[in-house]
């Protein structure tokens, strides 16, 4: 090859093989180059052909010293042929001429070394920590935006965080109390009517969330009754979603009123355990009642926020989490008792497992049971129902009317309603309330027979199941008109509303009967197991609430999961 056809080779770490004969020559001429071959960062090899023979120019840069060294080698054709054909030869026999680097290369090497030395001596630049924090915050914001972009993840995060906050408030003690003097059963449900919901003994007495959900539940019960009695509220209930929002605001103000009343009663009756009882009674009552009202309204806000921005019903989920928390102590007691004699407890455990399975199956049937009303579409055809990926999964459309649309909310409402007179009797000590407490205690031998309590319990569960604050048939009829659908053999308009009202009343009637029977049977089993096992029992009423809450949570998740595809389908048809 001629000088214009120079070949450039780039080697890393080890440019020349140790077995090659030219390695001995290079180690003799430049020992530092070959004695530490792995420390050489890069080696550039330029080969060219001249009139006298061949020429090699090698440039290498050392990794540690940051210094460039270059030299040139001229060799003849005989050297090339001998080096390629022989495996090893003496360096004295090589026909090699070494051309040392010129002065320009030396000056460039010295200038490079001086510049590297000055660069090493230069002080380190200042690192702006604030900019690092800004970059980190930007990365976190981007990750948060990606995470909360999904409606499912956002609602799941809100539900989990608010449920944790609802439990934290029960362990924040109110200031100004000597808790060594507070008895263990103070402000507990002494009637036994809510003991089947689980044990809450691990919570701190007189905590920030001491009132819990009782103000909201009482306000909801009163408003449900008034919506069927007062003409103005009956008219407001028939206005649809707007009327439902106004009723919710009325429930909030009623909750605030009952929270103030309950907080004043608790603050006044707890004076005997206060450290300010002798010096500042008024100050103690005002401060304690204010904190209790704040805690109760915080619980109300948590319930409403979970229902609107999360999954499921807020009050059911909060009570469900409290029940599961209380089960830890129950399971601990059970394991301590059966650890020594497992064979004696085996029939009892198998019986509990069988009853638990049956109760769970009935709870699923009560929660998921529905009646389907067929529909006909006259505005457009359902050709998209048979396409893959369509949000409409049924070829034949229908309206589902659940036999128990409120889930286990009637059971919760009835349980707390029957426990409220017992709480007032323990606080106020009124003879009338004490008699009511004995009547509403099925385990008492002084009051009425147990069947009285069970009858009252079943009646209220049935009553709360058939109540409907929102006018659902009217909303469904309006929605069907917008969708261009109708019920077969039923005229649109008033006839559709009357037909849907009849169907809703029928399904809720039979669903209320089934739920009241299941809840009453579970309560009877709870009281029986509590009588034969002093110290612990598994509440089957709480199992109903847990199963119902989980199914309602799953139903809510599924609804929000199919919402995007359903919205696209509705926009396609101009709804």
Curated annotation (Swiss-Prot):
Alphabetical keyword list: Amyloplast, Chloroplast, Membrane, Plastid, Protein transport, Thylakoid, Transit peptide, Translocation, Transmembrane, Transmembrane helix, Transport
Signal peptide position in this chain?
none
Do the record's keywords include Transmembrane helix?
yes
What's its job? Involved in protein export. Probably interacts with other proteins to allow the postimport or conservative sorting pathway for inner membrane proteins in plastids. Central subunit of the protein translocation channel SecYE. Consists of two halves formed by TMs 1-5 and 6-10. These two domains form a lateral gate at the front which open onto the bilayer between TMs 2 and 7, and are clamped together by SecE at the back. The channel is closed by both a pore ring composed of hydrophobic SecY resides and a short helix (helix 2A) on the extracellular side of the membrane which forms a plug.
- How is the quaternary structure described? Part of a second Sec protein translocation apparatus. Interacts probably with SECA2.
Which family does the entry's similarity section mention? Belongs to the SecY/SEC61-alpha family.
What is the designated name of this protein? Preprotein translocase subunit SCY2, chloroplastic
State the organism of origin.
Arabidopsis thaliana (Mouse-ear cress)
Protein encoded by which gene: SCY2
């Amino acid at each position: 090859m001629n000088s214009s056809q120079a070949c450039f080779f780039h080697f890393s770490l080890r440019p020349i093989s140790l077995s090659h004969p030219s390695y001995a020559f290079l180690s003799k001429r430049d020992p530092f180059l070959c004695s530490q071959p792995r420390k050489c960062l890069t080696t550039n090899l330029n080969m060219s052909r001249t009139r006298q023979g061949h020429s090699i120019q090698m440039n290498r840069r050392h990794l540690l010293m940051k210094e460039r060294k270059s030299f040139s080698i001229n060799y003849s054709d005989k050297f090339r042929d001998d080096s390629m054909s022989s495996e090893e030869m003496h360096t004295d026999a090589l026909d090699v001429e070494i051309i040392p680097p010129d002065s320009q290369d030396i000056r460039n090497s010295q200038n490079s070394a001086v510049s590297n030395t000055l660069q090493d001596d230069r002080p380190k630049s200042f690192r702006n920590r604030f900019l690092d924090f800004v970059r980190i915050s930007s990365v976190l914001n981007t990750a948060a935006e990606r995470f909360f972009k999904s409606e499912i993840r956002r609602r799941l995060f809100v539900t989990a965080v608010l449920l944790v906050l609802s439990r934290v408030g029960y362990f924040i003690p109110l200031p100004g109390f000597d808790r060594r003097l507070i008895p263990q059963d103070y402000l507990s449900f002494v009637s036994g009517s809510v003991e089947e919901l689980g044990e809450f003994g691990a919570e701190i007495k007189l905590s920030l969330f001491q009132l819990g959900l009782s103000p909201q539940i009482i306000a909801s019960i009163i408003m449900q009754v008034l919506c069927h009695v007062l003409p103005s509220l009956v008219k407001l209930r028939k206005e649809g979603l707007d009327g439902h929002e106004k009723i919710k605001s009325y429930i909030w103000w009623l909750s605030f009123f009952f929270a103030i009343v309950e907080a004043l009663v608790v603050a006044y009756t707890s004076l005997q355990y206060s450290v300010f009882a002798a010096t500042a009674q008024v100050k103690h009552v005002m401060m304690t009642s204010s904190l209790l009202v704040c805690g109760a309204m915080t619980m109300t806000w948590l319930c409403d926020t979970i229902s609107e921005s999360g999954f499921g019903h807020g009050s059911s989920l909060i009570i469900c989490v409290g029940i599961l928390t209380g089960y830890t102590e129950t399971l601990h007691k059970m394991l301590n008792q059966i650890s020594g004699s497992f064979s004696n407890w085996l029939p009892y455990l198998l019986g509990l497992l069988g009853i638990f399975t049956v109760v769970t199956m009935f709870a699923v049937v009560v929660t998921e049971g529905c009646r389907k009303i067929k529909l006909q579409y006259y505005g457009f055809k359902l050709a998209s129902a048979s396409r893959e990926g369509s949000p409409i999964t049924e070829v034949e459309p229908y309206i589902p009317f659940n036999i128990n649309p409120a889930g286990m909310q009637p059971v919760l409402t009835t349980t707390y309603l029957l426990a409220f007179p017992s709480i007032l009797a323990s606080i106020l000590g009124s003879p009338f309330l004490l008699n009511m407490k004995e009547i509403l205690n099925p385990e008492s031998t002084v009051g009425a027979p147990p069947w009285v309590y069970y009858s009252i319990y079943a009646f209220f569960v049935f009553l709360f199941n058939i109540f409907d604050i929102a006018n659902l048939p009217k909303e469904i009829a309006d929605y069907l008109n917008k969708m261009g659908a109708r019920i077969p053999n039923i005229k649109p308009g008033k006839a559709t509303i009357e037909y849907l009202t009849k169907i809703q009343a029928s399904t809720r009637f039979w669903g209320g009967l089934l739920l009241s029977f299941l809840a009453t049977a579970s309560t009877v089993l709870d009281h029986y197991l509590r009588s034969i096992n002093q110290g612990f029992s598994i509440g089957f009423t709480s199992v109903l609430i847990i199963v119902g809450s989980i199914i309602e949570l799953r139903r809510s998740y599924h609804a929000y999961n199919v919402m995007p595809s359903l919205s696209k389908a509705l926009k396609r048809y101009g709804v």
